[in-house]
């Protein structure tokens, strides 16, 4: 999940820096240099995510999880939240998807259509997975929206269903938050409306 925070963080920071006038930057830290650094970080983290995540776009809780080797060629097939070795983390997928989408959108605006499409389509693929079972909660008896989120696996803070060896089936506040946020982002984009950013209030304090 830390990787996903970085993916989204770099992409959102790029949007913010892009909105700041050139005159606000110093000679030692010019706008183009800051954007170049942020873009390098965004692409590095997003590329790592794409390379080390199963084809459905939903990651296991850690790319270095000790039990992943027991799953065989786990990257070549959809993640299995009900496996017996390592839990998936849908909250990381919700966070990472938004980072991919925002990066893809930025690159397209810069005229890099093919590169932008790579990240945009990866983000859409993740959202498609999250909007389907087993990740989308469809039971009226469950209060969460996004299933198979992880709190802190090493500390054993997660609920393990009866008869199972690893955690599954639960939601988290950050998972549900970022799930809703990425859906709202896409909704705004599809309607060609201004999408929300964390810095929007600077110019529109009442927004």
Give residue ranges: language-model regions:
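Glycan-recognition and catalytic cores of secretory/periplasmic carbohydrate-active enzymes
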Residues: 1-207
């Amino acid at each position: 999940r830390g990787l996903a925070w970085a993916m989204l963080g770099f992409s959102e920071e790029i949007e913010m820096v892009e909105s700041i006038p050139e005159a606000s930057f110093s000679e030692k830290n010019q706008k183009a240099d800051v954007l170049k650094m942020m873009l390098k970080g965004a692409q590095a983290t997003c590329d790592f995510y794409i390379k080390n995540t199963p084809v459905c776009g939903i990651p296991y809780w850690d790319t270095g999880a000790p039990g992943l080797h027991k799953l065989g060629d786990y990257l070549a097939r959809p993640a299995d939240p009900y496996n017996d070795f390592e839990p998936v983390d849908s909250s990381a997928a919700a966070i990472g998807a938004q980072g991919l989408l925002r990066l893809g959108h930025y690159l397209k605006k810069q005229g890099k259509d093919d590169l932008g499409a790579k990240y945009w389509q990866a983000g859409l693929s993740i959202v498609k997975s999250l909007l389907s079972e087993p990740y989308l909660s469809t039971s009226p008896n469950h209060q969460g929206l996004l299933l198979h989120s992880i709190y802190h696996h090493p500390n054993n803070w997660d609920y393990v269903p009866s008869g199972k060896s690893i955690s599954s089936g639960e939601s988290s506040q950050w998972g549900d938050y970022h799930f809703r946020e990425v859906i709202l982002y896409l909704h705004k984009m599809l309607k060609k409306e201004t999408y929300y950013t964390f810095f929007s209030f600077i110019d529109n304090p009442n927004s």
